Amino acid sequence: MTALSNIRNFSIIAHIDHGKSTLADRFIQTCGALQDREMQAQVLDSMDIERERGITIKAQSVTLYYDHPNGERYQLNFIDTPGHVDFSYEVSRSLAACEGALLVVDAAQGVEAQSVANCYTAVDLGLEVLPVLNKIDLPQVEPERVIQEIEDIIGIEADDAPRVSAKSGLGVDELLEALVERIPAPTGDRDAPLQALIIDSWFDNYLGVVSLVRVRQGSLSKGDKILIKSTMDSHLVTSIGVFTPKPLETGKLEAGEVGFVIAGIKDIHGAPVGDTMTHAKTPDVDLIPGFKQITPQVYAGLFPVDSSDFEKFREALQKLQINDSALFFEPDTSDALGFGFRCGFLGMLHMEIIQERLEREYNLDLITTAPSVIYEIKKKNGEILLIDNPSRLPDPGFVEEFREPIARCHILVPQDYLGNVMTLCMERRGTQVDMRFMGKQVQLIFDIPLGEVVMDFFDRLKSVSRGFASLDYEFDRYEVDKLVKVDVLINGDKVDALAMICHQEQARYRGGQLVEKMKELIPRQMFDVAIQAAIGSQIIARSTVKAMRKDVLAKCYGGDVSRKKKLLSKQKEGKKRMKQVGSVEIPQEAFLAVLQVDNQ
């Protein structure tokens, strides 16, 4: 077993594309954990989607043995963290398991908001943060400017920051030496009762739930009976070890170490991320602080195109949920779309990934309704409701207050694009909280309704700032506002899946835009199709998809006008009858038109 003083637990904090996974690959290669023939790019990103999108979704860990030039052998436990704003809770759990973090910054691009947010989390948790300049071999690097930015924005010394190129391996040996010297060794009593933090859990078809844990106090061996604090369920440990990145059984983990535990747990909710694990014989061990149940922020309806796929869809969601405790779903029915599920996600990226995995891994064809957030409704009798689906809103007559969730947004933007970004935030009904100039960058803090943020705010922010602005947001509070529900009627019938909640001042504009958009997307029928947007019983916008008609007068050459009138009125009668019985097929694009209303 490695002595406590020779263990280093660390994480890498980096913005998307700043080279975190590549640096991890270099560490693995330098320490000889995998043979060269087994190396592939982004070793730790195991899902195809992770590789394709170049993002890390689940936390992974790897234990490396590093021989220091001073002759000592060190055990380095690297815990990989997701970088995207949707997965910030997983980041905080990964960081809580470490004593230090490497802040990897692209030496050409500089500091981004996400790294700042995660870096603050690390500092709050008391971690030693070691800044690293990556991509130093690129021609356009500006290390002096970036060092100044790190000092101005994050407030940590960066003069002696190691300069590396993860791609070519330049400076990686020096970085490993600095890591061992700068990051403190873990503390912990190996004879105390067991206290271990669950960093991540995932499901294996043969082994059940595999938990990645960091042992804080005590030790854990194969054959021990363990207890999960939040569920108070006990399980028998069947396998225990470390990832090197391949699983390697060690039979024991001691204080300060990071590894995996398999105890035949059948359900991912049986080992929630952030929970505390202990021995069944010492159930009153203190909880490790910071554990919270994950709550979805964004809800959307998912419906199979072919209703016979419903059971297959349910199974697919259950399988995904086994591996993703943040995914929530419940059965939902829609008059327009039939049977499906109302699903809750952490954010828009999470939603896209789940949808893509359902379609790719389970061959499902799905229709997605526009996403919405949770609103708080206070009824006149004092009852408070939480509404995640616009079609479930009570009648406006019973509602006393309509409260919407507000997100606190931290935006970092170069000064040149400040005006565009502020205009965008104002358009989204944002209120400015703070603004600080830091070198060439400006840090903005805005309070913006969460419903506006989750729609397409991130994409719009990137486009108005040419990709330079970066965003981090978290839910802050509920606030009363004048909100209304806009219904869409097609030929007088409400289509529940198209309903949306928006601000009273924007309702006419958004209703009008939606109706126009629908007009382009609904194919022409043999009869007129009226598309209307309404608030309650008041119609606020209307548009008509004109009928296709056959030229019934083609065979009348000349002849009496009454003959023509007769043929036309006969056609008119037929269309009228058809309209009474005809139903309109609504294509998938039309359901997503709600999303594109703001993109004009």
Curated annotation (Swiss-Prot):
Belongs to the TRAFAC class translation factor GTPase superfamily. Classic translation factor GTPase family. LepA subfamily. It comes from Psychrobacter sp. (strain PRwf-1). It holds the Pfam family GTP_EFTU_D2. It catalyses: GTP + H2O = GDP + phosphate + H(+). GO terms for cellular component: plasma membrane. Its EC number is 3.6.5.n1. This is Elongation factor 4. SMART domains: EFG_C. The keyword Cell membrane applies. It is found in: Cell inner membrane. The gene is lepA. Keywords: Cell inner membrane, Cell membrane, GTP-binding, Hydrolase, Membrane, Nucleotide-binding, Protein biosynthesis. Its main location: membrane. Disulfide bonds: none annotated. GO terms for biological process: positive regulation of translation. It is an enzyme of class 3 (hydrolase). GO terms for molecular function: GTP binding; GTPase activity; guanosine tetraphosphate binding; ribosome binding; translation elongation factor activity. It comes from the Bacteria. Gene3D superfamilies: 3.30.70.240, Elongation factor 4, C-terminal domain, Elongation Factor G (Translational Gtpase), domain 3, P-loop containing nucleotide triphosphate hydrolases, Translation factors. InterPro entries: EF-4 (IPR006297), EFG_III/V (IPR035647), EFG_V-like (IPR000640), EFTu-like_2 (IPR004161), G_TR_CS (IPR031157), LepA_C_sf (IPR038363), LepA_CTD (IPR013842), LepA_IV (IPR035654). GTP binds at D17, H18, G19, K20, S21, T22, N134, K135, I136, D137. Required for accurate and efficient protein synthesis under certain stress conditions. May act as a fidelity factor of the translation reaction, by catalyzing a one-codon backward translocation of tRNAs on improperly translocated ribosomes. Back-translocation proceeds from a post-translocation (POST) complex to a pre-translocation (PRE) complex, thus giving elongation factor G a second chance to translocate the tRNAs correctly. Binds to ribosomes in a GTP-dependent manner. It is a peripheral membrane protein. PANTHER family: TRANSLATION FACTOR GUF1 HOMOLOG, CHLOROPLASTIC, TRANSLATION FACTOR GUF1-RELATED.
